[in-house]
């Protein structure tokens, strides 16, 4: 870096070198401002999509599930089958559950 400044001082003189350095700082400042504006715009965009799409979508999905499939899953008979008769260890179950339908035993 000092090599570059020394070379500029030799070729252009101190005034032009100072102008170049000042212009470089102004360019860095403007780049920072542009980056800040971009980040703010991206943040506002993300906040908009989260507020108006993601949250209502999740709430709507939960509402639909609660009032459709959720009601079906709250059936006490189904719950008793799941809790009491469903095989406990999946595919490795050696004694499958026995289900009764009208007094007939089904396995």
UniProtKB/Swiss-Prot annotation:
Pfam families the record matches: IBV_3C
GO CC annotations on file: host cell Golgi membrane; membrane
Signal peptide: none
Entry annotated with the keyword Transmembrane: yes
Stretches of the chain found on the membrane's Virion surface side: 1-11
Alphabetic keyword roster: Apoptosis, Host Golgi apparatus, Host membrane, Membrane, Transmembrane, Transmembrane helix
InterPro entries given in the database record: E_protein_CoV, IBV_3C
Topology with respect to the bilayer: Single-pass type III membrane protein
Protein localization: Host Golgi apparatus membrane
Transmembrane segments: 12-32
Disulfide bonds: none
Principal localisation: host cell
Residue ranges that the UniProt entry lists as topological domain Intravirion: 33-107
Any GO BP: disruption of cellular anatomical structure in another organism
rRNA-binding found in the keyword field: no
Stored HAMAP family: GAMMA_CORONA_E (MF_04206)
Entry similarity comment: Belongs to the gammacoronaviruses E protein family.
Subunit structure: Homooligomer. Interacts with the M membrane protein in the budding compartment of the host cell, which is located between endoplasmic reticulum and the Golgi complex. The cytoplasmic tails of both proteins are important for this function. Interacts with Nucleoprotein.
Functional description taken from the UniProt entry: Plays a central role in virus morphogenesis and assembly. Acts as a viroporin and self-assembles in host membranes forming pentameric protein-lipid pores that allow ion transport. Also plays a role in the induction of apoptosis.
Name of protein: Envelope small membrane protein
């Amino acid at each position: 870096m000092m090599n570059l400044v020394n070379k500029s001082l030799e070729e252009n003189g101190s005034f032009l070198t100072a102008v170049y350095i000042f212009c470089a700082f102004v360019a860095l400042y403007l780049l920072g401002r542009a980056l800040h504006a971009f980040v703010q715009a991206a943040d506002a965009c993300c906040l908009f999509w989260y507020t108006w799409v993601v949250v209502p979508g999740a709430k709507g999905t939960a509402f639909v599930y609660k009032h459709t499939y959720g009601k079906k899953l709250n059936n006490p008979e189904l719950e008793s089958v799941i809790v009491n008769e469903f095989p406990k260890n999946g595919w490795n179950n050696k004694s499958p559950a026995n289900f009764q339908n009208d007094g007939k035993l089904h396995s």
